Amino acid sequence: MRNFIIHILTGLSGSGKSTALDVFEDAGFYCVDNMPVALLPKFLEIPVNTASGISGLAFVMDLREPDFLATYPSVFNDLKAQGYRLTVLFFEAGENVLIQRYSQTRRHHPLAGDKGLVSGIRRERELLEELRASSDTVIDTSTLTIHELKIRLLARIRKSADHMPMRIHVMSFGYKYGIPHDADIIMDVRFLPNPYFVDPLKHKNGTDADVAAHVLNHSTGSAFLEKFLNLIDFLLPLYKNEPKAYLTVAVGCTGGCHRSVAVATAVFNHMKKREERHVEISHRDLKEAGQTT
């Protein structure tokens, strides 16, 4: 696993490590919460196919593990000496913020014991001071919203990773079968010429060249497609910076067989030419209409 970037997420309890781990998971990282430090070297020996789609590895490690403080220095140093790309992110927040978060969630602080929450927070900060000083990055989440934390983490991931893909799903659908609820962009193409009313094309679908030509190779179709693709080109960088891990572009016509399939296929091919590596296409309602690709 030396080819993968390894992010160690550590720091104060209640500072946002679990939220951060969710961001890494959405970014295509393989994630483990409360990973024992001593098991990390063995875990990294597991062979993983580099074509598996995994962007990297992220582990939450903290004082929930009794041996964490005694074990992490030697393990981290040994892994770096062996050539692993390991980076440590330390999360923290102000005392009053942590108290408020624990009051809201009503969760138990791991070091609170009989002395109470404030004592536990202060003791944890003291114990982790050396780790904080040696970390690659310290992130104070006191004033950050969840959205702002995501933006900061994704910016870091994009900077350090070989790629931080936004996964794009292009789909066609028929309005008669309902609008897809997970779509981010919906384009209604029922204004385009309908091949259903052309006998030689009626029983074909939009993946057939003659059907696609009927839909797109005329003034209205070609002008629309050019403008729609320009809109997609404009929006993709904005969605990537949002941040957004998944984007679904849905194209709809009446039955989901001809016009929507032709346009969705054109959008998909355009994205592939843009070298969008993580893009897929599906035609939701071809089977509903008795069509196959």
From Swiss-Prot:
Organism superkingdom: Bacteria
Pfam families in UniProt: PapZ_C, RapZ-like_N
Binding site for GTP: D62, L63, R64, E65
Keyword Aminoacyl-tRNA synthetase: no
Ligase recorded as keyword: no
Binding-site residues, ATP: G11, L12, S13, G14, S15, G16, K17, S18
Alphabetic keyword roster: ATP-binding, GTP-binding, Nucleotide-binding
Disulfide bonds: none
One GO molecular-function entry: ATP binding
Family: Belongs to the RapZ-like family.
Stated role: Displays ATPase and GTPase activities.
Name of the protein this chain belongs to: Nucleotide-binding protein Dole_0503
Organism: Desulfosudis oleivorans (strain DSM 6200 / JCM 39069 / Hxd3) (Desulfococcus oleovorans)
